[in-house]
């Protein structure tokens, strides 16, 4: 742990000595990478959640066909909520890319 702290302190001096233009370009590049990774993970999680929701709805309808209509309604509500989370991740990614508060 002490080695990591010393390494971070040593690197901090280099970061503070860097030119502002270089820091801004590096921050832009890291913002693009972070937005891509974050949006990719959100889409992956959303796809897994939607697949599980659809599978559970199909299984429920197969067990009790009389509840198919209610299950479909509940499934569509759940899918909308799952998709909303992915859209929130997209909004955060757009903020990181175009309205980054850390860029001067």
From Swiss-Prot:
Cellular component per GO, a single term: proton-transporting ATP synthase complex
InterPro entries in UniProt: ATP_synth_csu_bac/chlpt, ATP_synth_F0_csu, ATP_synth_F0_csu_DDCD_BS, ATP_synth_F0_csu_sf, ATPase_proteolipid_c-like_dom, F/V-ATP_Csub_sf
Site positions for Reversibly protonated during proton transport: 83
Keywords: ATP synthesis, Cell inner membrane, Cell membrane, CF(0), Hydrogen ion transport, Ion transport, Lipid-binding, Membrane, Transmembrane, Transmembrane helix, Transport
Compartment list: Cell inner membrane
Annotated CDD domains: ATP-synt_Fo_c
Membrane topology designation: Multi-pass membrane protein
Database matches in Pfam families: ATP-synt_C
Regions crossing the membrane: 31-51, 75-95
The keyword Cell membrane belongs to this UniProt entry's keyword annotation: yes
GO terms assigned for molecular function: lipid binding; proton-transporting ATP synthase activity, rotational mechanism
Family: Belongs to the ATPase C chain family.
Subunit organization: F-type ATPases have 2 components, F(1) - the catalytic core - and F(0) - the membrane proton channel. F(1) has five subunits: alpha(3), beta(3), gamma(1), delta(1), epsilon(1). F(0) has three main subunits: a(1), b(2) and c(10-14). The alpha and beta chains form an alternating ring which encloses part of the gamma chain. F(1) is attached to F(0) by a central stalk formed by the gamma and epsilon chains, while a peripheral stalk is formed by the delta and b chains.
Known function: F(1)F(0) ATP synthase produces ATP from ADP in the presence of a proton or sodium gradient. F-type ATPases consist of two structural domains, F(1) containing the extramembraneous catalytic core and F(0) containing the membrane proton channel, linked together by a central stalk and a peripheral stalk. During catalysis, ATP synthesis in the catalytic domain of F(1) is coupled via a rotary mechanism of the central stalk subunits to proton translocation.
HAMAP family: ATP_synth_c_bact
Protein name: ATP synthase subunit c
Source organism of the structure: Aliarcobacter butzleri (strain RM4018) (Arcobacter butzleri)
């Amino acid at each position: 742990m002490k080695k990591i702290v010393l390494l971070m302190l040593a690197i901090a001096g280099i970061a503070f000595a860097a030119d502002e233009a270089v820091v801004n370009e590096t921050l832009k590049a890291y913002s693009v990478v972070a937005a891509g990774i974050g949006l990719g993970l959100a889409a992956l999680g959303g796809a897994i959640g939607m697949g599980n929701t659809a599978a559970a709805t199909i299984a429920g309808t197969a067990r009790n066909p009389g509840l198919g209509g209610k299950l479909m309604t509940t499934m569509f509500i759940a899918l909308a909520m799952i998709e909303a989370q992915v859209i929130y991740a997209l909004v955060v990614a757009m903020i990181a890319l175009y309205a980054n508060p850390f860029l001067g």
